[in-house]
Protein backbone atom coordinates (compact mmCIF):
# COMPACT_ATOMS: atom_id res chain seq x y z
CA UNK A 1 0.00 0.00 0.00
CA UNK A 2 1.42 3.35 -1.06
CA UNK A 3 2.02 5.96 1.61
CA UNK A 4 1.44 9.62 0.84
CA UNK A 5 4.29 11.23 2.77
CA UNK A 6 7.89 10.59 1.76
CA UNK A 7 9.01 11.71 5.22
CA UNK A 8 7.74 8.37 6.55
CA UNK A 9 10.56 6.67 4.64
CA UNK A 10 13.49 8.99 5.16
CA UNK A 11 16.69 7.48 6.54
CA UNK A 12 15.24 4.00 6.89
CA UNK A 13 15.82 0.57 5.40
CA UNK A 14 12.72 -1.19 4.06
CA UNK A 15 12.93 -4.96 4.38
CA UNK A 16 11.43 -7.00 1.58
CA UNK A 17 11.21 -7.53 -2.15
CA UNK A 18 12.41 -4.41 -3.95
CA UNK A 19 9.49 -4.26 -6.38
CA UNK A 20 6.86 -4.57 -3.67
CA UNK A 21 8.58 -2.01 -1.44
CA UNK A 22 9.05 0.42 -4.32
CA UNK A 23 5.28 0.31 -4.84
CA UNK A 24 4.77 1.79 -1.37
CA UNK A 25 6.76 4.95 -2.15
CA UNK A 26 4.87 8.07 -3.36
CA UNK A 27 4.98 9.23 -6.97
CA UNK A 28 7.75 11.66 -7.93
CA UNK A 29 9.26 11.82 -4.44
CA UNK A 30 12.88 10.74 -5.04
CA UNK A 31 15.71 13.01 -6.21
CA UNK A 32 18.34 10.39 -7.00
CA UNK A 33 18.39 6.62 -7.40
CA UNK A 34 21.48 4.43 -7.38
CA UNK A 35 20.77 0.82 -8.33
CA UNK A 36 23.22 -2.06 -8.16
CA UNK A 37 20.94 -4.92 -9.25
CA UNK A 38 21.81 -8.61 -9.56
CA UNK A 39 24.13 -9.09 -12.52
CA UNK A 40 22.89 -12.60 -13.43
CA UNK A 41 26.51 -13.73 -13.57
CA UNK A 42 25.67 -17.37 -14.48
CA UNK A 43 28.87 -18.66 -12.92
CA UNK A 44 29.39 -22.42 -12.86
CA UNK A 45 31.79 -24.52 -10.83
CA UNK A 46 34.51 -23.24 -8.55
CA UNK A 47 36.83 -20.32 -9.26
CA UNK A 48 40.42 -21.19 -8.38
CA UNK A 49 43.32 -18.84 -7.88
CA UNK A 50 46.64 -19.62 -9.56
CA UNK A 51 47.88 -21.18 -6.30
CA UNK A 52 44.88 -23.51 -6.17
CA UNK A 53 42.93 -21.68 -3.47
CA UNK A 54 39.22 -21.18 -4.07
CA UNK A 55 38.14 -17.62 -4.88
CA UNK A 56 34.93 -16.38 -3.30
CA UNK A 57 33.10 -14.76 -6.22
CA UNK A 58 29.42 -14.02 -6.77
CA UNK A 59 27.45 -17.22 -6.19
CA UNK A 60 24.58 -15.86 -4.11
CA UNK A 61 20.96 -16.95 -4.44
CA UNK A 62 19.87 -13.40 -5.19
CA UNK A 63 21.92 -13.49 -8.42
CA UNK A 64 20.20 -16.61 -9.78
CA UNK A 65 17.46 -16.50 -12.44
CA UNK A 66 16.07 -19.26 -14.66
CA UNK A 67 16.84 -17.45 -17.91
CA UNK A 68 17.13 -14.04 -19.55
CA UNK A 69 13.36 -13.79 -19.94
CA UNK A 70 12.92 -13.95 -16.17
CA UNK A 71 15.81 -11.55 -15.58
CA UNK A 72 14.54 -9.01 -18.11
CA UNK A 73 11.03 -9.15 -16.66
CA UNK A 74 12.42 -8.53 -13.17
CA UNK A 75 14.48 -5.56 -14.34
CA UNK A 76 11.60 -4.02 -16.26
CA UNK A 77 9.35 -4.18 -13.18
CA UNK A 78 11.76 -2.49 -10.77
CA UNK A 79 12.80 0.09 -13.36
CA UNK A 80 9.15 1.01 -14.01
CA UNK A 81 8.69 1.66 -10.30
CA UNK A 82 11.89 3.69 -10.17
CA UNK A 83 10.61 5.86 -12.99
CA UNK A 84 7.31 6.39 -11.21
CA UNK A 85 8.88 7.54 -7.94
CA UNK A 86 11.65 9.63 -9.52
CA UNK A 87 11.03 13.38 -9.56
CA UNK A 88 10.86 15.04 -12.96
CA UNK A 89 14.15 16.76 -12.06
CA UNK A 90 15.74 13.60 -10.68
CA UNK A 91 18.15 11.10 -12.19
CA UNK A 92 19.06 7.44 -11.83
CA UNK A 93 22.35 5.55 -11.95
CA UNK A 94 22.41 1.82 -12.70
CA UNK A 95 25.66 -0.12 -12.46
CA UNK A 96 26.39 -3.42 -14.15
CA UNK A 97 28.92 -5.50 -16.01
CA UNK A 98 29.03 -7.10 -19.45
CA UNK A 99 26.62 -9.80 -18.27
CA UNK A 100 23.70 -7.42 -17.78
CA UNK A 101 24.31 -3.74 -18.49
CA UNK A 102 23.37 -3.91 -22.19
CA UNK A 103 20.07 -5.62 -21.39
CA UNK A 104 19.32 -3.02 -18.73
CA UNK A 105 20.20 -0.16 -21.07
CA UNK A 106 17.81 -1.57 -23.68
CA UNK A 107 15.00 -1.78 -21.14
CA UNK A 108 15.68 1.73 -19.83
CA UNK A 109 15.52 3.21 -23.32
CA UNK A 110 12.27 1.34 -23.97
CA UNK A 111 10.90 2.93 -20.78
CA UNK A 112 11.85 6.38 -22.15
CA UNK A 113 14.69 7.06 -19.73
CA UNK A 114 17.25 9.35 -21.36
CA UNK A 115 20.88 8.23 -21.10
CA UNK A 116 23.07 11.18 -20.11
CA UNK A 117 26.36 9.29 -19.83
CA UNK A 118 27.73 5.81 -19.62
CA UNK A 119 30.38 6.16 -16.94
CA UNK A 120 33.16 3.59 -16.72
CA UNK A 121 34.44 2.50 -13.33
CA UNK A 122 38.02 1.56 -14.22
CA UNK A 123 39.14 -0.75 -11.43
CA UNK A 124 42.74 -0.04 -10.48
CA UNK A 125 43.05 -3.40 -8.70
CA UNK A 126 40.73 -5.77 -10.60
CA UNK A 127 40.28 -9.44 -9.88
CA UNK A 128 42.45 -11.30 -12.42
CA UNK A 129 41.16 -13.84 -14.89
CA UNK A 130 42.54 -16.83 -13.04
CA UNK A 131 42.28 -19.26 -15.94
CA UNK A 132 43.98 -16.96 -18.43
CA UNK A 133 41.19 -17.75 -20.91
CA UNK A 134 40.16 -14.17 -21.69
CA UNK A 135 40.94 -10.54 -20.87
CA UNK A 136 40.90 -9.48 -17.24
CA UNK A 137 37.52 -7.84 -16.69
CA UNK A 138 38.75 -4.55 -15.22
CA UNK A 139 35.72 -2.28 -15.39
CA UNK A 140 32.02 -1.89 -14.75
CA UNK A 141 29.61 0.43 -16.53
CA UNK A 142 27.18 2.87 -14.97
CA UNK A 143 24.27 4.30 -16.95
CA UNK A 144 23.30 7.77 -15.75
CA UNK A 145 19.84 8.72 -16.96
CA UNK A 146 17.27 11.46 -16.57
CA UNK A 147 13.58 10.61 -16.39
CA UNK A 148 12.91 11.77 -19.96
CA UNK A 149 14.85 13.47 -22.73
CA UNK A 150 13.57 17.00 -22.06
CA UNK A 151 13.66 16.88 -18.27
CA UNK A 152 16.08 19.03 -16.30
CA UNK A 153 18.34 17.30 -13.79
CA UNK A 154 20.96 18.09 -11.17
CA UNK A 155 24.56 18.09 -12.31
CA UNK A 156 27.12 19.82 -10.11
CA UNK A 157 29.56 20.61 -12.88
CA UNK A 158 31.67 23.21 -11.06
CA UNK A 159 32.06 21.01 -7.99
CA UNK A 160 33.24 18.00 -9.96
CA UNK A 161 35.59 20.15 -12.05
CA UNK A 162 37.12 21.62 -8.88
CA UNK A 163 37.72 18.15 -7.43
CA UNK A 164 39.36 17.11 -10.70
CA UNK A 165 42.13 19.73 -10.47
CA UNK A 166 39.99 22.31 -12.32
CA UNK A 167 39.58 20.06 -15.36
CA UNK A 168 36.27 18.78 -16.68
CA UNK A 169 35.37 15.54 -14.93
CA UNK A 170 35.42 12.70 -17.44
CA UNK A 171 33.30 9.60 -17.85
CA UNK A 172 36.10 7.21 -16.86
CA UNK A 173 36.68 6.98 -13.12
CA UNK A 174 39.78 5.11 -11.96
CA UNK A 175 39.02 3.80 -8.48
CA UNK A 176 40.06 0.75 -6.52
CA UNK A 177 37.86 -2.11 -5.43
CA UNK A 178 36.55 -2.12 -1.90
CA UNK A 179 39.43 -3.61 0.12
CA UNK A 180 41.19 -3.39 3.47
CA UNK A 181 39.39 -1.78 6.40
CA UNK A 182 36.55 -0.58 4.17
CA UNK A 183 35.64 -4.15 3.24
CA UNK A 184 33.05 -5.28 5.78
CA UNK A 185 33.57 -8.80 7.14
CA UNK A 186 31.19 -11.16 8.91
CA UNK A 187 31.84 -12.96 12.18
CA UNK A 188 33.87 -15.61 10.36
CA UNK A 189 36.11 -13.01 8.73
CA UNK A 190 34.54 -13.52 5.30
CA UNK A 191 33.15 -10.81 3.04
CA UNK A 192 29.80 -9.69 4.44
CA UNK A 193 28.59 -9.00 0.90
CA UNK A 194 30.13 -10.27 -2.32
CA UNK A 195 29.58 -7.06 -4.32
CA UNK A 196 30.19 -4.26 -1.80
CA UNK A 197 30.98 -1.07 -3.72
CA UNK A 198 33.70 1.38 -2.61
CA UNK A 199 32.56 4.59 -0.93
CA UNK A 200 34.71 6.57 -3.37
CA UNK A 201 32.44 5.45 -6.22
CA UNK A 202 29.23 6.48 -4.46
CA UNK A 203 30.86 9.73 -3.38
CA UNK A 204 31.25 10.78 -7.01
CA UNK A 205 27.77 9.60 -7.95
CA UNK A 206 25.95 11.34 -5.10
CA UNK A 207 28.03 14.51 -5.06
CA UNK A 208 27.72 15.02 -8.81
CA UNK A 209 23.98 14.54 -9.13
CA UNK A 210 22.25 15.57 -5.89
CA UNK A 211 21.90 18.50 -3.52
CA UNK A 212 22.03 18.70 0.29
CA UNK A 213 18.83 17.32 1.87
CA UNK A 214 17.87 15.50 -1.34
CA UNK A 215 16.41 12.00 -1.06
CA UNK A 216 18.68 9.24 -2.39
CA UNK A 217 17.17 5.77 -2.84
CA UNK A 218 18.94 2.45 -3.35
CA UNK A 219 16.60 -0.47 -4.16
CA UNK A 220 19.40 -3.04 -3.67
CA UNK A 221 20.86 -1.63 -0.47
CA UNK A 222 23.15 -4.48 0.57
CA UNK A 223 25.51 -3.36 3.33
CA UNK A 224 24.51 0.28 2.92
CA UNK A 225 27.30 2.02 1.02
CA UNK A 226 24.82 4.34 -0.71
CA UNK A 227 23.20 5.28 2.59
CA UNK A 228 26.53 5.77 4.36
CA UNK A 229 27.83 8.19 1.73
CA UNK A 230 24.49 9.97 1.40
CA UNK A 231 24.32 10.53 5.15
CA UNK A 232 27.92 11.76 5.33
CA UNK A 233 27.18 14.27 2.56
CA UNK A 234 24.06 15.64 4.22
CA UNK A 235 21.54 13.85 2.01
CA UNK A 236 18.62 11.67 3.09
CA UNK A 237 18.63 8.00 2.16
CA UNK A 238 16.11 5.22 1.67
CA UNK A 239 17.29 1.64 1.33
CA UNK A 240 15.46 -1.50 0.25
CA UNK A 241 16.96 -4.86 1.17
CA UNK A 242 15.38 -8.29 1.52
CA UNK A 243 18.05 -10.07 3.58
CA UNK A 244 18.22 -9.36 7.30
CA UNK A 245 21.92 -10.17 7.55
CA UNK A 246 22.72 -7.28 5.22
CA UNK A 247 20.29 -4.96 6.98
CA UNK A 248 21.99 -5.65 10.32
CA UNK A 249 25.38 -4.73 8.85
CA UNK A 250 24.02 -1.62 7.16
CA UNK A 251 22.21 -0.33 10.25
CA UNK A 252 25.35 -0.68 12.38
CA UNK A 253 27.37 1.07 9.71
CA UNK A 254 24.89 3.93 9.39
CA UNK A 255 24.75 4.53 13.14
CA UNK A 256 28.47 5.28 13.08
CA UNK A 257 28.22 7.91 10.33
CA UNK A 258 28.36 11.53 11.50
CA UNK A 259 27.34 13.98 8.77
CA UNK A 260 30.02 16.63 8.33
CA UNK A 261 29.97 17.93 4.75
CA UNK A 262 32.41 20.70 3.88
CA UNK A 263 31.61 23.79 1.82
CA UNK A 264 32.47 22.07 -1.46
CA UNK A 265 30.21 19.13 -0.61
CA UNK A 266 27.47 21.61 0.28
CA UNK A 267 27.84 22.89 -3.30
CA UNK A 268 29.17 26.34 -2.52
CA UNK A 269 30.64 26.43 -6.04
CA UNK A 270 27.22 25.88 -7.61
CA UNK A 271 25.68 29.03 -6.12
CA UNK A 272 24.91 31.38 -8.98
CA UNK A 273 26.32 34.89 -8.60
CA UNK A 274 23.82 37.72 -8.08
CA UNK A 275 22.69 39.54 -11.19
CA UNK A 276 23.87 43.12 -10.68
CA UNK A 277 24.51 45.28 -13.79
CA UNK A 278 27.66 47.38 -14.02
CA UNK A 279 25.51 50.51 -14.24
CA UNK A 280 23.90 49.68 -10.89
CA UNK A 281 27.33 49.40 -9.26
CA UNK A 282 28.22 52.84 -10.64
CA UNK A 283 24.99 54.40 -9.39
CA UNK A 284 25.57 52.86 -5.94
CA UNK A 285 29.16 54.20 -5.82
CA UNK A 286 30.75 50.76 -5.85
CA UNK A 287 32.46 51.79 -9.10
CA UNK A 288 33.51 55.21 -10.40
CA UNK A 289 33.33 56.49 -13.94
CA UNK A 290 36.90 56.54 -15.22
CA UNK A 291 38.08 53.89 -12.74
CA UNK A 292 40.78 51.60 -14.12
CA UNK A 293 40.24 47.85 -14.43
CA UNK A 294 43.17 45.42 -14.51
CA UNK A 295 43.82 41.83 -15.51
CA UNK A 296 45.12 39.19 -13.09
CA UNK A 297 48.70 40.23 -13.85
CA UNK A 298 47.89 43.78 -12.70
CA UNK A 299 48.08 45.20 -16.22
CA UNK A 300 45.80 48.20 -16.76
CA UNK A 301 43.30 47.25 -19.47
CA UNK A 302 40.45 49.75 -19.60
CA UNK A 303 38.36 52.31 -17.71
CA UNK A 304 34.72 52.30 -16.63
CA UNK A 305 32.31 54.44 -18.67
CA UNK A 306 29.10 56.18 -17.59
CA UNK A 307 26.82 53.68 -19.34
CA UNK A 308 28.30 50.65 -17.56
CA UNK A 309 30.65 49.60 -20.33
CA UNK A 310 34.44 49.83 -20.43
CA UNK A 311 36.82 51.62 -22.78
CA UNK A 312 40.39 50.93 -23.82
CA UNK A 313 42.53 52.93 -26.25
CA UNK A 314 40.54 51.68 -29.22
CA UNK A 315 36.86 51.15 -28.44
CA UNK A 316 34.04 50.89 -25.91
CA UNK A 317 32.69 47.41 -25.15
CA UNK A 318 30.93 45.44 -22.45
CA UNK A 319 33.15 43.88 -19.79
CA UNK A 320 32.56 40.49 -21.42
CA UNK A 321 33.49 41.57 -24.94
CA UNK A 322 36.49 43.53 -23.66
CA UNK A 323 37.87 40.58 -21.70
CA UNK A 324 37.29 38.30 -24.70
CA UNK A 325 39.21 40.74 -26.87
CA UNK A 326 42.31 40.56 -24.66
CA UNK A 327 42.08 36.78 -24.45
CA UNK A 328 41.57 36.39 -28.21
CA UNK A 329 38.26 34.65 -27.58
CA UNK A 330 34.76 35.09 -28.95
CA UNK A 331 33.19 35.34 -25.50
CA UNK A 332 34.39 35.48 -21.90
CA UNK A 333 33.04 36.26 -18.44
CA UNK A 334 34.29 39.76 -17.66
CA UNK A 335 33.32 39.52 -14.00
CA UNK A 336 35.98 36.85 -13.52
CA UNK A 337 38.58 38.52 -15.73
CA UNK A 338 38.80 42.06 -14.34
CA UNK A 339 40.26 43.39 -11.09
CA UNK A 340 40.25 46.82 -9.48
CA UNK A 341 42.61 48.42 -6.98
CA UNK A 342 41.00 49.34 -3.68
CA UNK A 343 42.42 49.90 -0.19
CA UNK A 344 45.92 48.97 -1.38
CA UNK A 345 44.72 45.62 -2.73
CA UNK A 346 43.58 44.15 -6.01
CA UNK A 347 40.08 42.66 -5.72
CA UNK A 348 37.95 40.93 -8.33
CA UNK A 349 35.28 42.88 -10.11
CA UNK A 350 32.94 39.99 -9.34
CA UNK A 351 33.28 40.57 -5.59
CA UNK A 352 31.50 43.91 -5.96
CA UNK A 353 28.29 42.14 -6.94
CA UNK A 354 28.28 40.22 -3.68
CA UNK A 355 29.13 43.33 -1.65
CA UNK A 356 26.24 45.17 -3.25
CA UNK A 357 23.82 42.29 -2.65
CA UNK A 358 24.87 41.82 0.98
CA UNK A 359 24.83 45.48 2.01
Swiss-Prot record:
The lineage of its organism: Bacteria, Pseudomonadati, Pseudomonadota, Gammaproteobacteria, Pasteurellales. Keywords: DNA-binding, Methyltransferase, Restriction system, S-adenosyl-L-methionine, Transferase. The keyword Iron-sulfur does not apply. Residues 275-358 form the RAMA domain. GO terms for cellular component: cytoplasm. GO terms for molecular function: DNA binding; N-methyltransferase activity; site-specific DNA-methyltransferase (adenine-specific) activity. It is an enzyme of class 2 (transferase). Its EC number is 2.1.1.72. PROSITE patterns: N6_MTASE. Belongs to the N(4)/N(6)-methyltransferase family. One of its GO terms (biological process) is methylation. It catalyses: a 2'-deoxyadenosine in DNA + S-adenosyl-L-methionine = an N(6)-methyl-2'-deoxyadenosine in DNA + S-adenosyl-L-homocysteine + H(+). InterPro entries: DNA_methylase_N4/N6, DNA_methylase_N6_adenine_CS, RM_Methyltransferase, SAM-dependent_MTases_sf. SUPFAM superfamilies: S-adenosyl-L-methionine-dependent methyltransferases. This is Type II methyltransferase M.HinfI.
Amino acid sequence: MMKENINDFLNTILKGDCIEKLKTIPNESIDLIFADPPYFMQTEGKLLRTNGDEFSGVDDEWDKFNDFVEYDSFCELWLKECKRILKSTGSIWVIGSFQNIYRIGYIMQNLDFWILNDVIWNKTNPVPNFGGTRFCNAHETMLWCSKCKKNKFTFNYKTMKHLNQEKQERSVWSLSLCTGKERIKDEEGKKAHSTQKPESLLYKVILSSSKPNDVVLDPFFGTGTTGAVAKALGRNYIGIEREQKYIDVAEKRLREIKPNPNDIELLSLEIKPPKVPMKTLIEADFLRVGQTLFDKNENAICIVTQDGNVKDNEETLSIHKMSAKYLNKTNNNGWDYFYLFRNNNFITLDSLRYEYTNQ
